[in-house]
Amino acid sequence: RELVEACRRNRVDFVWAIHPGQDIKWNEEDYANLVRKFEWMYDLGVRSFAIFFDDISGEGTNPERQTELLNRLNEEFVRVKGDVTPLTVCPTDYSKLWANPTPQGSLAIYGRTLDPSVAVFWTGDVVCSDLTPETLEWVNSRIRRPAFYWWNYPVTDYVRHILMQGPVYGLDTTLTADDLCGLVSNPMEHGEASKLALYGVADYTWNVAAYNPIDNWERGLALLAPEVRDAYRTFAIHSCDTETGYRRDESWETETFRLADRTPERAAALRAELERVVRVPARMEQCANKELLAELRPWLVEFGKLGERCLRALDLMELYAGGDDAAFWASYVANRMTPDQMKAYEAHKSGTMKLQPFYEQAMDDMASGLFERLTGEKPAGCKGIGSFQNLRTTLSKLMFDHDSTTHYTSGVSQQDGDWIGADLGCVRDVHEVAILQGRNSVDDVDFFDHALVEASVDGRQWTALGDSLRTVYDIRWTGEPVPARYVRLRRLESPRTHWASVRSFEVNPVRAERLGFGVEADDLTAALYAFDRNPSTSFLLDGALRFGVPAGAKGYTMLLQPDADAAPASVRQYAADGTLLSETHVDAPLFRLTLESGAARVELEGALRIFEIIAE
């Protein structure tokens, strides 16, 4: 009752909505229970009501039954009361993505049979999508009335680790009351942090034709946090994108770059912005809106850390260019994110479009460059490619992290011809491909149920690796080597409209039998990553690792990260008969070992992370 009265004082219609749910029976008992609840809410002051038939299956989806119920409620409750606003309904077919477009579809049935006063929700072409004349024309021609647009923004129930703080855009400014009867915004669970977006939605609906997203955003920042407006703006401009699904522009005033494109001017400009980022958490503590600050604080903490590691990555670029490999690698491993740091960032992300990718790409580029400088060859790592837009983001790295509990997801519905793949960086002889589709291998729906593995030298002409696959989660191809730079899994004809997910995408995974020397460790599978010619992977040693010396080897360069809290790791060399030839200790992250004459086996014992062991 308090909420209803507060809404009335502020000229807001409080709408009470009910979801009849999966178990509706369409009988008199159900109807009587529904009316009874309406009466209870009416007695508390509610004068606006809605019924939702979204996200259900079974008998509850029957559009004829739905319209019969709505028409009866309209006749026996709304009109009888006299002071109740027209009903609102969310149909089961609330998105073009799965709506039946035919005259027999539920939307067309709504158009023919539903009382014209009832407003009908519509989310657009997909669940989260822009408000366009085209989507309204499509739905309005079927429901025979202007739709009530349900805009799923700034809601983050599908990306709870994100705060949507960017400008409100994607709303067409040529629309009139003939096109839509209303616009409802679905906010985040963070009420204060949602106000920046709601301010934009309110501004748009107040004067559609004159709405300007950036002008509105700038005013909203000053209105919500005037005393820390600049700091709030710095955070907000880097906290806009979802990374998946409904992508939003972010960091549009910031230019980032790859290692090869670094110039002093670009580095100086980025450094200035990153220094502003680092100052944001402390400055935001002066925000007078303590509820807003409390909601933002977990993200602000991680935002400051993001700025710090990006600044260190800039410094590392200079150190890398200087050519002192030992000094560079020592600073490099100190700037790597630990599992705990990554977990904290993943829970409260910002800077996902430019800042975190800058950090990750800079670190990857420098590690790859160092490997190439040490060996004269390109590392064996992969990067994600494909038809889905977010494969260009750092999300695609989840396919290559050797962790089957994580997964890349497309964030949008799959279609025939879609594909997910790997760029090997150069042409290699491909002899094995191993792919884990879906979020699990048992009953997940987010996978290509009809697909083909293919390889290509140039990305234009593709060769099939094996036959087409139907309903296969765990894919493995082996065969005679095929020269290729690109390997992909391409969807073939299928009615499936789910997202697509991949837990693992391996090309030529390292195998003990292919190394040419023996390896012994408690966890042999993990230990092989020390020899996979890819410095982006690593093996956490806590014990002993033993490996044979290949013919012709004179020494090793080891890319390591010693455990600062543990004793220095030991390195021992043994002859073929087991005689100990020498023993030393790891004294630097980039450790060089000269082999003794007759050395046949090396043993590394201690606690440290091994990125690569390179024979020379």
Tell where the protein language model's regions lie, with residue ranges.
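Feature activates predominantly on carbohydrate-active enzymes
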Residues: 1-30, 37, 43-47
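Catalytic-core regions of glycoside hydrolase
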Residues: 37, 44-47, 56-218
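Short loop/turn motifs at secondary-structure junctions
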Residues: 45-47, 83, 179, 429, ...
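C-terminal functional modules
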Residues: 213-381
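Disordered, acidic Ser/Thr/Pro-rich linker "stalks" and the adjacent N-terminal cap
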Residues: 371-430, 436-450, 467-468, 497-499, ...
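Trp- and acidic/polar-enriched beta-sheet ligand-binding modules for extracellular glycan
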Residues: 442-507, 565-616
